[in-house]
Amino acid sequence: DSLSGVENLVGRSPAMLQLKDQIRQIAGSTSTVLVTGESGTGKELVARAIHFSSPRSQEPFVSVNCMALNPGVLESELFGHEKGSFTGAVAMRRGRFEQASGGTLFLDEVGELTPELQVKLLRVLQERRFERVGGSEEIEVDIRIVAATNKDLMPLVQAGTFREDLYYRLNVVHIPIPPLRERREDIPLLVAHFAEKAAKENGIPPKTFSTEALNHLSGYEWPGNIRQLQNVVERCLVLVPGDVITLEDLPAEIRDEEAQFKSAVDLLPVQLDLADTLERIE
């Protein structure tokens, strides 16, 4: 999937050019990578770019969000389990480490791992082997691990909630992703990219943004980063009836300068109101 490589990272700002160079430099190695950045900056896109630019590109890319599952389920999800190892384990199941064999395992929100799972992950990083839950057979895997977090892990290390040895095992190569407000010159390119994507996905004619609207989008703080920008562009494409999206068409929270101080938590993915959409189209 060449479109998941470096060329799929949109932007020509100095920060993005540096990021792309970093990815090209490390793609050929097997070193563990720690990707850091605020929520919505595109950490999985960067992990995919690393994988699909590497010699492992024809092998699996497997993604796990460490925060999305409770610790008991996550352990079985990562390491797999043997038949009968717990209630409901009616068959042997291979975990994500085995599924990613030969390829890349992406561990998102790695700062959320429990101390017990941190120990198990450390062992895999050191020895490239593990046992399934309820099993005794050692399984060896050849995988590259790319981890990501939107937290600063060092304070967690100092507080004793994140293992120092695991931190250094993960942080062999560190790739920080800049927030959108630090690469504003990329915003017009991203708007065009997301507008084209949303038009194709929704089966509607392409639309453009007026210069005034683009200038306003480029000046906004984007606390939710690229994810928030993509939501706003899609909302405008679906709701605005004309061919050109103007400043007045932008959502109120984007037009309102005070909205720049809203927390990213408040800016949830857009929920389209079908009745409102039809009313505006008519």
Residue ranges: model-predicted function:
Residues 8, 21-87, 98-114, 142, ...:
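Conserved post-Walker A coupling segment in P-loop NTPases
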Residues 2-20, 72, 272-277:
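Dynamic helix-loop-helix/coil hinge segments at AAA+ ATPase domain boundaries and subdomain interfaces
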Residues 2, 6, 12-15, 54-59, ...:
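Nucleotide-binding/hydrolysis machinery
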